[in-house]
Each structure stands twice: as structure tokens, then as C-alpha cells.
Amino acid sequence: MAASGYEGTELGPWSYLPADPTTLRRELDARRLSLVGAFCPVTLHDRDRSAASVRTARETIDLLAAAGAPVLVLADAGDERRAAIAGRVPADGSAGFSHGEWRRFSDGVNTIARYARERGLLTAFHPHVASYVERTEEIARLMRDTDPTLVGLCLDTGHVAYGGGDPVEIARTHARRVRHVHLKDLRREVRADALARQLDFPGAVSLGVFAPLGDGSLDLRGTLSALRAVGYAGWLIVEQDVRLGVSPIAAPLRDAKRSRAYLTEVLAA
């Protein structure tokens, strides 16, 4: 990341980077990288699993607070059922949470976000492909059911688009809730192929559905313009989902530099 010219990073999967805050800060400082936050998937709708998810979230929050990071990026962990129909989730809600599950999930998100605020962190909820908050309607439901003073939105352009949504419209509709941004580009022709073949989400990633910024089909300029219009001043996290050893994307350093060059050009315009 440092070699690519980036200024910050999220934590990544637990143990990907050091879990000791002193060691973590030392290693990041040596590379002149800021710790921005951490992606934390949770299962909160299931009574039998929610307590463990809350504990994991609290551990993540404690590490972020000790390391000086500003944002917890919370997401539903999803399951194989939703992964199998990623991008093809029925609009009628038949493959989604029940009313009771929505209530438990939203209450759990509020609980975690409240603890994050106590530790000095913002919480941004990340709609994610293959999770139960993927479709535009599901994003709206979660925003409606959670406390706006506690829970914001992490706008991930690639995941919103793969789920059938419009990142520009999401940025405008939920402007006051956007607290964090993941910038991805997506190849719509690859998405269409994956959906036509009824591939699960990992299968689509293996096809190379996500591209370096500027090489895909998304209106990233429009998204950034919409964010500017509402005064967004947070981090822009550049991402490109791949599967190691499977994806045709073979040069992560090259792609990371390419994405940064594109973003620098757009922001300077």
C-alpha cells in the first residue's frame, strides 16, 4: 500500500495486521500509513449467534480505539443462501429477514454503534453483496430502523452496483448518513455474465467482476460529485475484490497504482 502511494488502510481480517495496538501503530507509522478503520461482519438476527458477534465487534472497537482509528465498518456476515443469489435477490423480500429478524438486527447494530461511540469511533454500516443488506430497499430499511445519531452508511460503490443499486443515487438519498466510502469499479458485462450463469458471489469475483478504478462501468465521477455536493470529507478507501490464485487480476501493485492515479486525476478536476 505504501509503495502504491496510499496514505491509509483498514485493518483487514483479524490477524492480517498485528492485533497488538502498539505493534500495529509502530508498523503503520514506519510506512507512513494511517489506520482508518476495520471491516467487521456480524450475525445479529440469529439469537444463538448474536452475542458472539457483539463480543467480536467490541474487541475490534477496542483495538481501533487503542490504535487511533476513527471508523468501525460494520456489515452483516451473510450466509451461503444469500451468496448463492447475490445480485439476484428477489425484490419482494422473500429471501430476506423476517420482521422480527430485522428488529433484532437493527437493535444489535445500534448496540454495537453505541459502544463504538463511547470509545470515540464512528460507525458506518456497509451494505454487502451476499449479505442480508444488499438491495437498495434493504439499505433503506436499515437506515430507517437504526439511530441516525449512532449509525451511518459506508457507501461501497461496487457492492451497491452488484446488488442492483445506483451508487450515485444512494449517495444522494442517504447523504446525511454517509460516513465512510469504499470506491470500487465494476465491469457490468462480467456482472451480467455471472448473473446469467447464476454464479454465486465468489464465482463472480473469480471472473474479474471488479476492476481498477476507471477501467469498469461505474460512474465514479458522478459518485464523487454527489459526495462533494453534500460536503463529505471522510476517507476514500480504494478496493478491488479478487480471489487469490483464481482471479485473472494478476498484478495488485500495478492495479493499486492505476486506481490511485485515476482517483487523483478525478479529484483534481
Each model region followed by its residue ranges:
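Acidic/histidine-rich catalytic cores of soluble enzymes
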Residues: 8-9, 106-217
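Acidic (Asp/Glu)-rich catalytic clusters
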Residues: 1-3, 18-37, 55-69, 110-118, ...
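Active-site acidic/histidine proton-transfer and metal-coordination neighborhood
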Residues: 49-153
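Conserved, mostly hydrophobic/aromatic
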Residues: 1, 9, 28, 64, ...
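A short, acidic, amphipathic alpha-helical segment used as a generic capping/interface helix at domain edges
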Residues: 215-229
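Non-cysteine beta-strand/loop elements that form the S-adenosyl-L-methionine
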Residues: 36-38, 71-77, 175-189, 237-238
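C-terminal helical cap(s) of enzyme catalytic domains, especially alpha/beta-barrels
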Residues: 248-269
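Active-site beta-loop-alpha junctions enriched in small/polar residues
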Residues: 12-14, 40-45, 77-79, 128-130, ...
